[in-house]
């Protein structure tokens, strides 16, 4: 144990990192925070990616997680009207089966709400064009034409949970924004630490395109032409 700690401190002193990007999973994350504290590295200079941003990543670390930052595509907490609506119409009505109500508003719980919004609205978008009965390719079209502007988010009660979304054939992300959140170990809750921030799309998209082109070539997949309406809306998948 002593040797391992000495080695960790040696790495810290030799590399002298300003920040450390944490790309952990499961128990790796709280262990990283506890190790940072033991070696004198500020946990406030650990920045977690989306696999290191949940309540389950910080709570096991206890006080060692205080001040830890993580990126998130959606803030934690009861940040949107739709969350209050779910609490009122589902849980207070005795219809929910969530055993631990403290999970309401947690990172993964809010992600589930957001997934429900996206899937439902994409299905409705497809049904508006093709009718009530849709196949998988038509649902894909619904996702590729999903528009959630401010008025739509307001109507859904999702304002504050996610930025405006505009998914297309060319852009399956639909918005390249994220926020940073910081953990308050005393209150056991995340607090938003930034506005919506756009990543370096030019850099990331080039990497995505390169990987996609290779995958298509290796698997004999014909690339769709999103500028060609007939090819873009080809439903014979």
State the predicted function of each range.
Residues 8, 28-32, 79-87, 115, ...:
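Stable alpha-helical elements in mature extracytoplasmic
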Residues 15-26, 32, 43-49, 108:
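Periplasmic-binding protein-like
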Residues 35-116:
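Extracellular/periplasmic periplasmic-binding protein-like sensory domains
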